C-alpha cells in the first residue's frame, strides 16, 4: 500500500505543509510498477488525493502503471494503519465508490512532504537572500530571472527553491552555472562596498 500526500497539501493542519511535493506521484508510480515487476502476484494499492502528472509523458507513465501493471489507484484517505498478526491492517475510504476498505498489507509506503533543510534560514540570513513563507529561497523574478536571487551574485538551483524532480534540478543547475560563468568572464566586477559602522 502506497499513501500519497502524507503531510503535504494540508491547509490548516498543524504539522502539514500547504504545498504539493510535486515529485511523489511519479516516484510512487515508478515504485509501484517495480514492485509488480519483481512480485507479479502482489496487489499494489495507491491511495491518493489527486494524481498530478505535470511533465512530458508523465500521464502516459501513470496510465501504464494502471493499465499494464494493474496497480490499484484509489481516490481516498487512509485513516488508520494497525499492526496485526505480522501484517499491517489498513483502514481507508474510497471516495469514488463511497465505501470503507480494509486491506491486509505487508508494507505501507508513505509519500511524505518535502521540506526545506533547517539550515536554510541561517544561510539566507548570512547571504541576505529572501525566502518564502515555507522557508524556500525565492527567485528575483519567476519568469525573467528564475535562477537569480534578489541578492546579486547568489544563484539558486534545485530543491532550495521548492520541490523539483531530477531533470528540472539539472536544467536549473545548468542555467545557474551559465549565469555564474557570465559573471566571472567579465574583466571587472562592480559591487556595493560594505562599510563597518563604529
Functional labels for PLM-detected ranges:
Residues 1-198:
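Residues forming the flavin
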